[in-house]
A protein has these predicted regions:
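PLP-dependent class I/II
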Residues: 3, 7-13, 18, 25-33, ...
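A glycine-/small-polar-enriched, mobile loop at the entrance of the PLP active site in fold-type I
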Residues: 36-39, 54-73
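Conserved N-terminal alpha-helix of the aminotransferase class I/II PLP-enzyme fold
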Residues: 63-96
């Protein structure tokens, strides 16, 4: 029996490959320092867990509306107004099984075979394959380290064709940690507005910004931006809720209705009791978010200081998320070879940049303890000296 062409063209995940090797080594008792984590190493705050437990004990375990419980959709609309300057009705908000699910729903609702979707690289690993799954074509726009790994408006414009249907933006960005300024986003919106192109704005890392960086929601920039933008966010990164699988999108009414219809025929509703936890996350004390950001900031600064002292590697200071993208091209290895050798020789797991569309780089996550960061960077430095 054959599988479908769409399934066959999906690329195996390099992130999962490295992760599985690292876990196998740990299972054998090997001391592996893992820098591959794409999730906070903190526990979900207690008041969120308590709300979900209370929902379970109260029997809130049945189906909910496919787009999410009304009170959560309303709370998200209120959050978007307060935090992001966005005016959405609850009916324009669709709750899903994670921000990843929301991204795919948005692409499926707006793109079709023959369409092109522009994606700046380095990119989050799943974007191109999501585009391929709906039969559209990803168009990759490389960015440069000297530009802080950010796509310029002219790069976007040069990549456009009559088939361009969507631009995917991720700020703060995984894997680069780049945060686009309002001026940079306004220039990009100006290009999209002239061609009536959707913008999928993945803002899952919005709460994790550092120094003087400010997160700006693209849809807040102008009415035209609002009309073109599908805003995606969730609870995984800000509230350490990766396993709860809850994300959401907010979009123009026609797109939101299409996504609701799609979701009703695929996954139906997100987990009922997880939604109650998410409601508590939005309504409750936000101190845990600030505490987590402060700890990440300390780790970020330590990691950057250590990396700056290693010859022949460079790293742009990330302004958001919890990753550092390290350029190792001067060391003479592909990113996959570098990651494989680093793991096998030094017991350090990193993600090769090839997974993100840039083979010059590797990604290090500081979503792990400072002790592991110190030990892992000692090994990383010793390994680089052997090349």
């Amino acid at each position: 029996m054959e599988i479908s062409e769409r399934a066959a063209q999906l690329t195996p995940s390099l992130t999962l490959s490295i992760d599985s090797k690292a876990k196998a080594m740990k299972a054998e008792g090997i001391d592996v320092c893992g820098f591959g984590a794409g999730e906070p190493d903190f526990d979900t705050p207690e008041h969120i867990k308590t709300a979900a437990i209370a929902a379970l004990q109260a029997g809130f375990t049945k189906y909910t509306p496919s787009a999410g419980i009304p009170e959560l959709r309303q709370a998200i609309a209120e959050k978007l107004a307060a935090d992001n300057g966005l005016t959405y009705r609850a009916g324009q908000v669709i709750v899903s099984n994670g921000a990843k699910h929301s991204c795919y729903n948005a692409i499926l609702a707006t793109c079709q075979p023959g369409d092109e979707v522009i994606i700046p690289a380095p990119y989050w690993v799943s974007y191109p394959d999501m585009v391929r799954l709906v039969g559209a074509e990803p168009v990759i726009v490389p960015t440069m380290e000297r530009n802080n790994w950010k796509m310029r408006a002219e790069d976007f414009e040069n990549a456009m064709t009559p088939r361009t249907k969507m631009l995917i933006m991720n700020s703060p960005c995984n894997p680069t940690g780049s945060v686009y300024t309002q001026e940079e986003l306004e220039a990009i919106v100006e290009v999209a507005r002239g061609e009536d192109i959707y913008i999928l704005s993945d803002e899952i890392y919005e709460k994790l910004v550092y120094d003087d960086a400010k997160h700006v929601s693209i849809a807040s920039l102008a009415k035209e931006a609002y009309d073109l933008t599908i805003t995606v966010n969730g609870f995984s990164k800000s509230y350490a809720m990766t396993g709860w699988r809850l994300g959401y999108l907010a979009a123009p009414e026609a797109v939101a209705k299409a996504v609701d219809s799609i979701q009703s025929h695929t996954t139906a509703n997100p987990s009922s009791f997880s939604q109650r936890g998410a409601l508590a996350a939005l309504k409750g004390d936000q101190q845990s978010v600030a505490d987590m950001r402060e700890e990440f900031d300390m780790r970020r600064n330590y990691m950057l200081d250590r990396l700056s002292k290693i010859p022949n590697v460079t790293a742009v200071k990330p302004q958001g998320a919890f990753y550092v993208l390290v350029n190792v091209s001067q060391l003479g290895l592909t990113s996959q070879n570098f990651a494989d050798r680093l793991l096998s020789k030094s017991n350090v797991a990193v993600v090769p940049g090839a997974a993100f569309g840039d083979d010059r780089t590797i990604r290090l996550s500081y979503a792990t303890s400072i002790d592991i960061i110190k030990k892992g960077l000692d090994r990383f430095q010793d390994f680089c000296r052997t090349l």
